[in-house]
Amino acid sequence: MVKTPSDPLEPGSIIGILGGGQLGRMTAIAAARLGYRVHVFSPDQSAPAKEVSKFSTTASYDDLVRLEEFARSVDVVTFEFENIPAQSLLTINNIAPVRPNYRALEVAQDRLKEKAFVSSLGIGTTNYWPVQNVEDLEQALV
């Protein structure tokens, strides 16, 4: 099992992927070529990644019991898109390591946090303005 982010994942290990879309499918194919097995967790029974994965679980991202079972069956977990509930990753993170860290998901789910994070790294972004109401929108357009 992976203990720290820098620990290598040994071939034959099981990578858990939350999400079973096309990106999950491509990740599963690449992982298999490198000697890893993949367990896909998706609420979609016919998720494309399930077709190319050794294991799969069909359940809601809010089903904490199934998430815990999934986490116990893998060596590390990743996610293919940012619409996974943060609570799901927190549940998994108590059992199996999540890469990237679950905090990356929290940033990716909030566009203002995402812009602020990128800006804090010294990377330029397009101009943006937080808009919560009509007054904010009017101010942003000035």
Predicted regions and their residues:
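ATP-binding N-terminal substructure of ATP-dependent carboxylate-amine bond-forming enzymes
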Residues: 1-116, 135
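Active-site nucleotide/adenylate-binding loops and adjacent lid/helix of ATP-dependent enzymes
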Residues: 107-142
